[in-house]
Amino acid sequence: MIRKLTMIQAITEAMDQKLAEDSRVMLLGEDVGVNGGVFRATEDLIHKYGANRVVDTPLSEAGIIGAAIGMAMNGLIPIVEIQFLAFIYPGFEQIVSHAARMRYRTRGQYH
């Protein structure tokens, strides 16, 4: 039988499952910790996995995505929450200008 979930419930459950199955998975974003995210998608995850894996960040989408790129380069598996679509654009610069070119900028040290 297929369970009926809201989109937020499905997202929360997926993040919970990934955090549970791999200690390298980290969740970061604005208000994802104690506040549980703007839509409560991360509610209670900080209590379950701790502040070292569910990380509240400053209000800086470029900083959040840049940090996630660095984490991924060093073996972690970051999940980033960007609260609203319009806020993704400042962070997208990190993906286009840094993550996409990292292999070539490091002579293949990072893929």
Question: Over which residues does each language-model region extend?
Answer:
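Thiamine diphosphate
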Residues: 1-111
